[in-house]
Regions:
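Bacterial N-terminal signal peptides that target proteins for export
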Residues: 1-7
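N-terminal signal peptide c-region/cleavage motif recognized by signal peptidases
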Residues: 13-20
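Charge-rich (acidic/polar
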Residues: 21-195
Length: 195
């Protein structure tokens, strides 16, 4: 009798949504990717490559104090950049996109060829090495294109502009808002150039 009462109480207290859940085996992080045209690239990846976007390829520069031209232009008023710096940055961005877009297309084509080879089951060691070399060559060139523009920006930016960029991008704490203990707030703000 106690077991019946316990089961009835459990059934009443269990939400219907819990009872409706049913899984068909373990989910993997790749579930759903089988429907992609190119399994190794999402739709967003392809859009980013086709527009000449960074695709995270320049993080080594970005996170080590070498700003990228696209983000510099987005923040040009807050940094601030002068007209000459804006013109130089725009030229870098234009050059980068001019090179990155066709190279991104090359990477997409290489990943498509790899995808097709596996889909057809026509892969052997030699063809796999060739397909991978083509994809990695495109990716290496694309990464070079993006990273090389980052190290060019620091040639004409002032150190305080780079620091401001890092703060605005969330890579550094804002010294104007985080006054160290023991410092006179007014003097510290003046010393740090806070407005």
């Amino acid at each position: 009798m106690k077991v019946k009462t316990l089961l009835m109480a459990l059934a009443i207290s269990t939400p219907l949504s819990t009872l409706a859940q049913h899984t068909h085996g373990p989910q993997t992080p790749y579930a759903g990717m089988q429907n992609r045209a190119i399994k190794s690239l999402s739709d967003n990846d392809i859009k980013e490559l086709r527009r000449g976007g960074g695709w995270g390829l320049a993080l080594a520069a970005e996170l080590n104090g070498m700003p990228g031209p696209a983000h510099l232009l987005e923040l040009k008023d807050q940094i601030p950049l002068n007209q000459d710096q804006v013109a130089k940055t725009q030229a870098l961005l234009d050059d980068m996109r001019k090179a990155a877009i066709p190279t991104g297309e090359r990477l997409i084509a290489a990943e498509t060829a790899l995808e097709n080879a596996f889909a057809k089951g026509s892969v052997d060691e030699a063809s796999l090495r060739r397909l991978l070399a083509e994809a990695e060559s495109a990716k290496t060139e694309l990464r070079f294109i993006h990273l090389s523009q980052h190290f060019k920006t620091v040639q004409y930016l002032k150190p305080e502009q780079i620091k401001r960029y890092s703060v605005l991008r969330g890579y550094a704490e804002d010294p104007c808002k985080n006054i160290p203990a023991g410092h006179n707030p007014e003097m510290y703000r003046r010393h740090m150039g806070c407005s």
